[in-house]
Regions:
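Zn2+-dependent metallopeptidase catalytic core
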Residues: 28-57, 62-131, 137-154, 158-166, ...
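Zinc-dependent metallopeptidase catalytic helix centered on the HExxH motif
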Residues: 127-204, 209
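Active-site-proximal alpha-helical
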Residues: 85, 196-289
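A generic secondary-structure signal for well-formed alpha-helical elements
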Residues: 81-85, 89, 158-166, 178-186, ...
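Extracytoplasmic/secreted proteins, especially bacterial periplasmic and envelope-associated proteins
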Residues: 69, 73-80, 84, 145, ...
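Sec-dependent N-terminal signal peptides of Gram-negative exported proteins
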Residues: 4-25
Length: 422
């Protein structure tokens, strides 16, 4: 597992991971149980066509009618993903079944093209560890789509082995981050569209697997911004998320979560005294210039007369609202007065991004407010060369507890925004 990270608290050796995990576990303010432990049952059939890799402990089982060419392509894609995961990324391979083999079942109707499922807990492991098997959709086009699908399955199998207690939303997002590193030909991303079309939602949303795969935009951004090498920070999250679940429990241990690890590891990462709240706020601004673009809560012309806008959708913790203000018609010496109000018990961070006609962010201006406040205001000046502004409101969590992805449902908060020429 890689340890070469820019974040000092993640760049540690294995003997120190355990004490680090104990520390981050204490930062979670909830006693939330982890995901349910639900071992899957491999599909059954009378006429499976079996083939095995000659390079890795992988065997596939194809339902009748699967072409030999597709069976061969699946094994080749699995071998390539296995090689890159365990080679360049230095991550552990999936744990197979009791026979020591990782099994693939070529069937129909698999979301994402392929997916690894929990087989069984390892009763001998000191920390939680699990074996897995994978389902592969027989309709997946050969070539890059099949490579990406098998990369998703192999990486998810590695995660089952390393940190099986991670919530499904975070798992899908992190798996997608590494799978796209492995699959260099991957292009087009409908999942990213799903993620960017709902910026007000929490960064992980158990109601939509497409949204959660798209949330790789967040984990990829964190990895690029703070990691020492591609994929290193995501793998560091796995290493620092070991759990101990009692035998016979119905749910995995609830801590530490990936966000517990980030909360400790990214302290002071942006500036001295910065926290994970500041990381959430920075990502909310940066996603405004990502492709595909996020859906704006409002888009308005230059407000020569003050306008008062209400949130069309309340913002969940770790989510954000983006309001676009076009500067067409604004005078050369224009100034914009921004006044934000939001509901009690929500902690929001507001900022303004100046963007040129090419979509490049020229400047980011934080709108200061004290902790637990429900009001913030600023006047934005020096708008020469600016095509439009994004006013961004990020919900960084409630005043009562830190964000826990295992909670599954989070209370969103609304806001009111007053914008007018000053």
């Amino acid at each position: 597992m890689k340890g070469s990270l820019a974040v000092a608290s993640l760049a540690i050796l294995f003997p120190r991971w355990l004490s680090g995990a104990d520390a981050v576990a204490q930062t979670s303010s909830q006693k939330q149980a982890g995901p349910a432990i639900e071992p899957a049952v491999p599909p059954s059939g009378d006429r499976w066509q079996k083939a095995c890799s000659v390079r890795h402990p992988i065997c596939e089982h194809a339902t009748a009618g699967t072409t030999p060419a597709f069976q061969l392509a699946v094994l080749e894609s699995a071998d390539r993903a296995w090689d890159t995961l365990t080679g360049s990324l230095e991550a552990p391979p999936p744990d197979g079944a009791a026979d020591g083999v990782w099994h693939l079942y070529l069937v129909d109707g698999v979301d994402g093209g392929a997916h690894a499922l929990l087989d069984a807990r390892d009763p001998r492991a000191h920390f939680d560890r699990a074996s897995s098997f994978a389902l592969v959709d027989r309709s997946t086009p050969q070539g890059c789509p099949l490579d990406l699908a098998l990369a998703r399955a192999v990486v998810r199998g590695s995660l089952w082995r390393t940190a099986p207690a991670i919530d499904e939303g975070s798992a899908l997002a992190q798996v997608e981050t590494l799978a796209r590193l492995i699959t260099v030909c991957a292009s087009g991303n409908e999942d990213a569209v799903a993620f960017q079309s709902r910026p007000e939602h929490a960064l992980v949303d158990p109601s939509s697997s497409a949204f959660d795969r798209g949330a790789s935009m967040f984990f990829g951004w964190v990895d690029i911004t703070f990691g020492g090498s591609p994929g290193a920070l995501v793998e560091g999250l796995w290493a620092l998320s070991p759990t101990r679940t009692p035998a016979g429990a119905g749910s995995w241990a609830g801590t530490p979560t990936p966000f517990d690890v980030l909360r400790v590891s990214l302290r002071d990462a942006l500036w001295q005294g910065s926290t994970l709240d500041d990381v959430f706020a920075r990502f909310a601004i940066d996603r405004a210039s990502m492709d595909p673009a996020p859906r704006a809560a409002w888009r308005i012309a230059w407000p020569a007369r003050a306008r008062r806008l209400a949130a069309p959708e309340p913002v969940a913790p770790t989510g954000a609202s983006l309001i676009r203000v076009d500067l067409d018609g604004a005078p050369p010496d224009a100034k914009l007065h921004v006044e934000a109000e939001w509901e009690d018990y929500g902690r929001m961070r507001w900022a303004v991004a100046k963007v040129d006609a090419g979509g490049r962010v020229l400047a980011q201006i934080a709108i200061g407010s004290v902790d637990r406040a429900t009001h913030a205001t600023i006047t934005v000046e020096k708008l020469g060369g600016v095509d439009h502004l994004f006013v961004v409101g990020a919900n960084v969590g409630t005043t009562e507890q830190t964000f826990n992805p295992d909670q599954g449902e989070w209370e969103p908060h609304g806001w009111l925004l007053t914008l007018g020429a000053d």
